[in-house]
Regions:
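Exported/extracytosolic protein signature
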Residues: 1-167
Length: 167
């Protein structure tokens, strides 16, 4: 007889684990109102730099942001410029970062509350669309809380005083 040979034509599939991951940090810098001292108070502007980095091994697309800004009493504030409505949706390749800028001019009532508290959240899609990726901003200069997702807090200077003159 003749030898019979048979080959298997099934391809070998090596799956590469997708690990989508983003990290968001937010830092604040102060622009003091012209002619004022270095104390943080009404009229000064807080400039927020939000940095988002793709720490995973796959591209993250449709990254959108929310931004929560409150005063020390929990009253909701609105950014003066920049923010999620201006930033739109972005995509980041593995290892890629992008900085986004927003600002808030401190109102008297926010200054009187003693602090302005800000947190950004980024949410994006993995390539398969099945794993949403999300991260809450961390203030790298702030107090580290459990999970490293601490808000960016700017404390205002409170100098209450009253002068009474009797004639």
């Amino acid at each position: 007889g003749e030898a019979v040979s048979d080959t298997i034509d099934d391809p070998v599939i090596d799956e590469i684990a997708q690990t989508p991951s983003i990290e968001v940090t937010k830092e604040a810098s102060i622009i003091h109102q012209a002619g004022t001292d270095s104390e943080i108070s009404a009229g000064d502007t807080i400039v927020y730099t939000v940095s988002v980095t793709n720490n995973g091994n796959v591209t993250i697309s449709n990254i959108n942001f929310t931004d929560d800004l409150t005063d020390g009493q929990g009253n909701v504030l609105s950014l003066t410029s920049g923010g999620p409505n201006d930033w739109g949706s972005i995509s980041l390749a593995p290892g890629e970062s992008q900085d986004l800028i927003a600002s808030y001019t401190i109102s008297q009532s926010a200054s009187d509350s003693g602090s302005i508290i800000n947190t950004a959240t980024a949410t994006g899609d993995s390539p398969q669309g099945t794993d949403d990726v999300s991260d809450v901003s961390d203030d790298p200069q702030g107090t580290t809380l459990a999970g490293d997702d601490d808000p960016t807090v700017v404390n205002t200077t409170l100098n209450p005083s009253i002068e009474v003159t009797k004639a």
